[in-house]
Amino acid sequence: MADPRDKALQDYRKKLLEHKEIDGRLKELREQLKELTKQYEKSENDLKALQSVGQIVGEVLKQLTEEKFIVKATNGPRYVVGCRRQLDKSKLKPGTRVALDMTTLTIMRYLPREVDPLVYNMSHEDPGNVSYSEIGGLSEQIRELREVIELPLTNPELFQRVGIIPPKGCLLYGPPGTGKTLLARAVASQLDCNFLKVVSSSIVDKYIGESARLIREMFNYARDHQPCIIFMDEIDAIGGRRFSEGTSADREIQRTLMELLNQMDGFDTLHRVKMIMATNRPDTLDPALLRPGRLDRKIHIDLPNEQARLDILKIHAGPITKHGEIDYEAIVKLSDGFNGADLRNVCTEAGMFAIRADHDFVVQEDFMKAVRKVADSKKLESKLDYKPV
């Protein structure tokens, strides 16, 4: 009796294993079927898109009733048209770009605002991965900048509790090479927000009204992509003091400045758009640009003192391959009047001296030679007296 029973048990185990194996294969096949169904649907949608007729780009002028809108097509004429049921009609405000059906001219979908290629390029400027620890000797300036730019974007409720309006922007001013652009890059890389880097001289256009239009589009883009930081470098290119005499080119720059002033403090508020401006010549800027309400805080970034120079030198010398003890304090004592860029140049020159000596490392003597060489070239520079603004 035992043999048939054992045989039956063995058959049962065998069938059970086969069942598990088939069940596993069935699950795999179901996953494959799911994936293939997705691919099929995507291919079908792509095929429909290829076969479908194109659409006309238009602009909403006015809403007549709940279902009817006046739109202007790009080819000129105006039409009273309907709208797809699935669309949120509250978004169809005057000025909204929409796609119209070729035959019925029904509003099929809304389109994003048209962006100038220059503004689009500004938004794709990568600030890089810069941390505050990489900036030496500017702890007070970093604190002031973060209070104005970072705090209103990350903790706006603090300002609501106290009952004050958050600052709109700040001006970074000081001698060249002191880290103004680096500070702005650090703020942008530490915050999860959009960043527009604008070189002010690139805004100026030879055609009347084009520069002001670019400023408008830049601020419209920033408002559509909040939170956003606009960093305008070398603001003295368009923010110079206004005067009555001048050529037509000067008047065009003044019109650009007036558009900038209007966008910064006009009827249309900036909300979560923050401004950082940088310049080497604060004395040439227009008083209307500097007033509170536009640039609420002016941060002076002066030449670093001895302790700050020591911090900066250690940061720049960190990645360098060194041999033996390096006396940073002795190097810093010879670097009176140096800015951050000069101290980085000292490290580069020290590396060049090591390469010239056919070494794979830098020694103390290389740094001493480099700091003397940079000090000699500094004598050629002219100095500006930076008064507080």
From Swiss-Prot:
Any GO BP? ERAD pathway
Question: Is the keyword ATP-binding assigned to this protein?
Answer: yes
Which residues are annotated as modified residue Phosphoserine in the UniProt record?
Answer: S244
Look up the domain of life of the source.
Eukaryota
Q: Which Gene3D superfamilies match?
A: 1.10.8.60, Nucleic acid-binding proteins, P-loop containing nucleotide triphosphate hydrolases
Q: Where in the cell is it found?
A: Cytoplasm; Nucleus
A GO cellular component annotation here is: proteasome complex
> At which residues is N6-acetyllysine found?
K72, K206
Keyword annotations from UniProtKB, A to Z: Acetylation, ATP-binding, Cytoplasm, Nucleotide-binding, Nucleus, Phosphoprotein, Proteasome
Which Pfam families has this protein been placed in? Answer: AAA, AAA_lid_3, Prot_ATP_ID_OB_C
Q: Which pairs are disulfide-linked?
A: none
Please provide, alphabetically and separated by semicolons, the GO molecular function terms listed in this UniProt record.
ATP binding; ATP hydrolysis activity; identical protein binding; proteasome-activating activity; protein-macromolecule adaptor activity
- Report the main location listed first in the record: cytoplasm
Task: Check the record and name the InterPro entries matching this protein.
Answer: 26S_Proteasome_ATPase (IPR050221), AAA+_ATPase (IPR003593), AAA_lid_3 (IPR041569), ATPase_AAA_core (IPR003959), ATPase_AAA_CS (IPR003960), NA-bd_OB-fold (IPR012340), P-loop_NTPase (IPR027417), Prot_ATP_ID_OB_2nd (IPR032501)
Record: residues binding ATP: G174, P175, P176, G177, T178, G179, K180, T181
Q: Which PANTHER family match?
A: 26S PROTEASOME REGULATORY SUBUNIT (PTHR23073)
Q: Describe its partners and assembly state.
A: Component of the 19S proteasome regulatory particle complex. The 26S proteasome consists of a 20S core particle (CP) and two 19S regulatory subunits (RP). The regulatory particle is made of a lid composed of 9 subunits, a base containing 6 ATPases including PSMC6 and few additional components. Interacts with PAAF1.
What role is this protein assigned? Component of the 26S proteasome, a multiprotein complex involved in the ATP-dependent degradation of ubiquitinated proteins. This complex plays a key role in the maintenance of protein homeostasis by removing misfolded or damaged proteins, which could impair cellular functions, and by removing proteins whose functions are no longer required. Therefore, the proteasome participates in numerous cellular processes, including cell cycle progression, apoptosis, or DNA damage repair.
Similarity comment: family membership: Belongs to the AAA ATPase family.
By what name is this protein known? Answer: 26S proteasome regulatory subunit 10B
Taxonomic source organism: Homo sapiens (Human)
Gene encoding it?
Answer: PSMC6
